Curated annotation (Swiss-Prot):
NCBIfam families: PPR. Belongs to the PPR family. PCMP-E subfamily. One of its GO terms (molecular function) is RNA binding. Coiled coil: none annotated. Transmembrane segments: none annotated. This is Pentatricopeptide repeat-containing protein At3g16610. GO terms for biological process: RNA modification. PPR repeats lie at residues 1-32, 34-64, 67-101, 102-136, 137-171, 172-203, 204-238, 239-269, 270-304, 307-341, 342-372, 373-407, 408-442, 443-473, 474-508, 509-543, 546-576. Keywords: Repeat. The lineage of its organism: Eukaryota, Viridiplantae, Streptophyta, Embryophyta, Tracheophyta. InterPro entries: E_motif, Pentatricopeptide_rpt, PPR_At4g14850-like_plant, TPR-like_helical_dom_sf. It comes from the Eukaryota. Residues 581-654 are annotated as: Type E motif.
Length: 654
């Protein structure tokens, strides 16, 4: 009787009645003698998401090694309730206890691995699958596809998917959602078309929802409209998740009018819909409209839709557009509404003040957080670097490690950037060691930051060693190394690397060409620089020269002493020269004691607005040419107008 009642409670997820039955069983001492009863109680608590109670009952099961069902239930409960580490630990304990996993064990432990991005553990479990009777099981193989796709191991996901003897809708959707998470839009569209062509399956609601991340991140308006049309034809467009997804795609595709039209349709919106509309306005630099939507949430019956995400988005908009008073108002609302106790909101407020430049407020908010996490520290470390307080980031980095909080990639990137700003080789080398020990040294972004740090600390050989040992290079990797060769005066090495880059099939971008022009300038490679700029102007690299490229060419000519040619180059620019271009030329006039040309350039600079830089450079140019009266006259003008040079200081670690 009790077993049938328990079965009813499990099916209806009636926790209260189930606990009453459990109490009766305890009073009659029936639970200790029956593993069947204990397994069903574990099922009850697991189905009701009462994970701790489920584990307590699970631990009472006698001879658990003969009953794999209980292990499966417990692993599933952990994996489904964000206790991924415990699910993985229990799986290994299951193996050590001599219990053979079933086909229901693997999908949930792989789900835990995907949540933890535990690639090594997942690959080990894959080997266990291959040694079991479930290597071709569709349910298990789909879980493997989902694991590899979510972890970014897309080639392995394709391999497992292609080797599946039979694929259902769930397997196709796992591929689509996994590739979509990594913004592989072309692959997502291809899979969407192939599922019908190859296996005769029509995309369902889950397929469409899985496509939205790739469509949104790519800003794919044309494809987004096509998917919207498909949803309308198939009757999916009335689904709330689909409406919100389409809204988000339009907003991220810079088509905010269409996004607003979807938002204004008569349907019951949830908190995700409101947040998507606010985020769309913020992303499209329409902070006023974002504020209006946020206010609309507060004054109508939608106040329950206000979430930490919505508060974070509106604060992000205030930070981006320098609206300190608006951000403070949102901060006050968060305090009054009780959101200030939410760690996500607290971290967002720190990030807002840090991005705005109000580090005092950021530190004050940081000090008020009781239990800080890695995001709390990351927000402040990044803020310190951005606001020219890089030395503070070292203290915070040390503090978080002593507090038992493990730094992540964002932390390390912030600290390495601080090391670059200060040329702090000691701190940078220590951070490099931490990256190696904890497995971050294979990350492309970390390697790029390490190269930048070593380059600016004068250790070009170490930077090159990092570059040579990288598993995967992106365009930033090449650009960083090119800039490194350039600032160290190794123009020929930079040109050689540039050629190697093209030979490997990597197309240069505007930053690449800026780096190679800068390298030519610092090495006096005038002819090579001219040839490169002419190729760029002809469109050989599909990059249009911008003001920075013209500034580099001006510096190249002026630094080599071709002042008249540089001046002629500046006058023939397709747009008005800015203060940087003219400052570069004026600095060269000082170096080569060309007071006449310096005077002409100074007049152009002053037409853009008088600056301390232009007057100081002109005064120095006159002094270098021994025109002391003119130099004194410029100094007097500078003094009368209050354009005084601010004394500065700098330091490096030795």
């Amino acid at each position: 009787m009790f077993l049938s009642l328990l079965e009813t409670c499990i099916r209806s997820r009636n926790l209260v009645l189930g606990q009453v039955i459990h109490q009766h069983l305890l009073k009659r001492s029936l639970t200790l003698s029956s593993s069947t009863v204990l397994v069903n109680l574990t099922r009850l608590y697991a189905s009701c998401n009462e994970v701790e109670l489920a584990r307590h009952v699970f631990d009472e099961i006698p001879h658990p090694r003969i009953n794999p069902i209980a292990w499966d239930l417990m692993i599933r409960a952990y994996a489904s309730n964000d206790f991924a580490e415990k699910a993985l630990d229990l799986y290994y304990k299951m193996l050590n206890s001599g219990v053979r996993p079933t086909k229901y064990t693997y999908p949930f432990v792989l789900k835990a691995c995907a949540g933890l991005r535990a690639i090594d553990d997942g690959k080990l479990i894959h080997s266990h699958v291959n040694c079991s009777d479930f290597a071709t099981d569709m349910y298990v193989c789909t879980a493997l596809v989902d694991f590899y796709a979510k972890c970014g191991e897309l080639e392995m996901a394709i391999k497992v998917f292609d080797e599946m003897p039979k694929r259902d809708m769930v397997a196709w959707n796992a591929m689509i959602s996994g590739f979509s998470l990594h913004c592989c839009l072309t692959d997502v569209i291809g899979l969407f078309l192939d599922m019908r062509r190859i296996d005769g399956l029509s995309p369902n609601l889950s397929t469409i929802v899985g496509m939205f991340p790739a469509l949104g991140r790519a800003g794919a308006l044309r494809e987004g409209k096509a998917v919207h049309g498909y949803c309308t034809r198939m009757g999916f467009s009335n689904d709330l998740v689909v409406k919100t997804g389409i809204l988000d795609v339009y907003a991220k595709s810079k088509c905010i009018i269409y996004a607003r039209r979807v938002f204004d349709l008569d349907f019951k919106k949830n908190e995700v819909t409101w947040s998507a509309m606010i985020g769309g306005y913020v992303e499209n630099e329409m902070i006023k409209e974002a504020g209006e939507v946020f206010f609309q949430m507060l004054v109508n019956d939608n106040v329950a839709m206000v979430t930490p995400v919505a508060i974070g988005l509106i604060l992000m908009g205030c930070a981006r557009f320098g609206d300190l008073s608006g951000g403070r108002c949102v901060h006050c609302y968060a305090v009054k509404a009780g959101f200030i106790l939410d760690l996500t909101v607290q971290n967002t407020i720190i990030s807002f003040y840090a991005k705005y430049g109000s580090l005092c407020d950021a530190f004050r908010q940081f000090s008020e957080i009781g239990l800080k996490d890695v995001i709390s520290y990351n927000s402040l470390i990044t803020g310190c670097v951005v606001n020219c307080r890089p030395e503070e980031s070292f203290r915070l980095f040390h503090e978080m490690r002593t507090s038992g909080i493990r730094p992540d990639i964002t932390t390390l990137l912030g600290v390495l950037t601080a090391c670059s700003h200060l040329a702090a080789l000691g701190h940078g080398s220590s951070c490099h060691g931490y990256c190696v020990v904890h497995g971050y040294a294979v990350n492309t972004s970390i390697c790029n930051a390490l190269m930048d740090m070593y380059t600016k600390c004068g250790k070009l050989d170490v930077a090159k060693r990092v570059f040579d040992t990288m598993h995967k290079r992106d365009i930033v990797s090449w650009n960083t190394m090119l800039f490194g060769f350039g600032i160290h005066g190794l123009g020929k090495e930079a040109l050689s690397l540039f050629n190697s880059m093209q030979e490997t099939g990597v197309n240069p971008d505007e930053v690449t060409l800026l780096a190679i022009l800068s390298a030519c300038s610092h090495s006096g490679l005038v002819d090579e620089g001219k040839q490169l700029f002419n190729s760029m102007s002809r469109g050989d690299f599909n990059v249009i020269p911008r003001i920075d490229h013209y500034n580099c060419m001006t510096d190249l000519l002026a630094r080599a002493g071709y002042l008249d040619e540089a001046y002629d180059f500046v006058n023939k620019m397709p747009f008005e020269p800015d203060i940087r271009v003219l400052g570069t030329l004026l600095s060269a006039c000082w170096t080569y004691k060309n007071a006449e040309l310096g005077n002409e350039v100074s007049k152009k600079m002053q037409s853009l607005g008088e600056t301390t830089e232009s007057l100081v450079l002109l005064s120095n140019t006159y002094s270098a040419a021994e025109r002391w009266e003119d130099a004194a006259r410029i100094r007097m003008i500078q003094k009368k107008r209050g354009l005084l040079k601010t004394p500065g200081y700098s330091w490096v670690d030795v």
